[in-house]
Every structure is written in structure tokens, then in C-alpha cells.
Amino acid sequence: MRRSVIIGSLLATAAVGYAIYFDYKRRNDPHFRKTLKRRYKKVHEAKKQEEKLATKKFDITVEEALQVVASTPVPSSAEEKELFFMQQVARGEQLFQQQPDNIKESAACFYSALKVYPQPVELFAIYERTVPEPIMNLLRAMQAKESIPSVE
């Protein structure tokens, strides 16, 4: 017990000593302050760049999912639409359970089902309660992207 108390107190003293040294250098050494600012800016820029890439990747995923939905043929009769709806919802759930990382295909299935459902607002409310959050975020983005008219 005595040895562990001595080692613990030495480590605590070293940590406090380093904190005091760091604070002294930060306050009194202009070169050290510049170095800290450069590091902070570098980390901040890297974080911004990473966020831009993530946003761009998400937008590409939304576009690809909308292309999958657009290429899916939509049935015309009510019975076929009902069957199509049930198949797409089941397939979306199955895809997410089998491959949780691959949300694009699952979201495309859920969105295809949403497009043929007679009351899409109610179905979207049901999706918000039952569908996992990553897929729901993709569905929201798909709906927003599709509702905005494109200028061509």
C-alpha cells in the first residue's frame, strides 16, 4: 500500500508540474503560442474539410438512392401497388437487418414504398417511429431533394 501511495503521489506531482510548465510556456513564450495557434488552425481546417467531405458523400448517396428509386418500375393497379408496397417495406427491413452499414438500398426500398402509398404523410410519421435513424435521415434528405424543383 505504501509503495502505491508513493507512486501515485509522484505521478500526481509530475502531472501538476507539467501543467504549470505548460501554462508558463503558453503565457510567456510567443513562439510557443504561435505553434499552438498553428496546430489549432490545422486541426480546425482538417475538421472543416472532413465535414465537407461527409456532406458531399451524403449528397452523393442521396442522389444514388433517388436514381435507384427512379429506375424501379411503379405498378399501376391498386392491388399491384399494395403488393409492391408490402414487398418494398419487407425488403427494406431485411436489407437493413442483413447489412446495417449499407443503408442506401434499404432507404431506396422504403422510399419506393412511400411513393406508392395512398397517404404518404401518415406513412412518413410511421417511418419516423419505426425506421432506424440513419435510414430516416436519408429518407428526409431524399424527400427534400425530390421536392425541390431542379433547374436544367
Swiss-Prot record:
The gene is tom20. Residues 1-4 are mitochondrial intermembrane. It is a single-pass membrane protein. Forms part of the preprotein translocase complex of the outer mitochondrial membrane (TOM complex) which consists of at least 8 different proteins (tom5, tom6, tom7, tom20, tom22, tom37, tom40 and tom70). It comes from Schizosaccharomyces pombe (strain 972 / ATCC 24843). Keywords: Membrane, Mitochondrion, Mitochondrion outer membrane, Protein transport, Transmembrane, Transmembrane helix, Transport. One of its GO terms (molecular function) is mitochondrion targeting sequence binding. The lineage of its organism: Eukaryota, Fungi, Dikarya, Ascomycota, Taphrinomycotina. It comes from the Eukaryota. This is Mitochondrial import receptor subunit tom20. Residues 23-152 are cytoplasmic.
